[in-house]
Regions:
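A structural signal for well-ordered alpha-helical scaffolds and beta->alpha junctions
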Residues: 9, 13, 25, 57-64, ...
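Short glycine-/acidic-enriched loop or helix-start segments at secondary-structure transitions
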Residues: 6, 48, 101
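A solvent-exposed, acidic/Ser-Thr-rich amphipathic alpha-helical stretch
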Residues: 27, 33-79
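A beta-strand edge to alpha-helix "cap/lid" segment located at domain peripheries
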Residues: 1-3, 61, 65-121
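General secondary-structure edge motif
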Residues: 8-9, 40, 44, 84
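Short, low-complexity N-terminal intrinsically disordered segments enriched in polar/charged residues
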Residues: 1-30, 34
Length: 121
């Protein structure tokens, strides 16, 4: 796989933020491999999963749907996008204005295979 370019990273982040702001889970999930793994402190709080990890579009999609129902005015404000060799990091302001950074690792077909969410207090 070719290294990720800044152009790809910017396009991915725009599409990802736009899909979330539209509350369109199908569009959000279209960026992910079927068996991707998500790690987030919010999984503990919202999904009740003590490990903070969920696997697969079904589990993560159900968690995200629950989050959207809990926070119906959810809106992300993009701050920055950073490109790595096989990863993209998006820095944004999320729910309740909280700073967030998500790191996405890409696999075949430029689909996310692992995602890691980080939040400020």
């Amino acid at each position: 796989m070719e290294p990720i370019t800044q152009a790809f990273a910017q396009q991915f982040s725009r599409e990802w933020i736009d899909a979330w702001n539209a509350h369109d889970l199908d569009r959000v999930l279209s960026h992910y491999a079927d068996a991707f793994e998500m790690s987030s402190p919010m999984i503990v709080q919202i999904a009740g999963e003590p490990s903070g990890r969920l696997c697969g579009k079904d589990q993560v999609g159900a968690y995200w749907l629950k989050a959207l129902r809990m926070i119906p005015a959810l809106h992300f404000e993009w701050i920055a996008t950073l490109a790595g060799i096989d990863s993209v990091a998006i820095h944004y302001r999320g729910a309740n204005g909280r700073l967030a950074l998500e790191v996405f690792h890409f696999g075949p077909g430029r689909r996310v295979v692992k995602a890691f969410a980080h939040y400020a207090e």
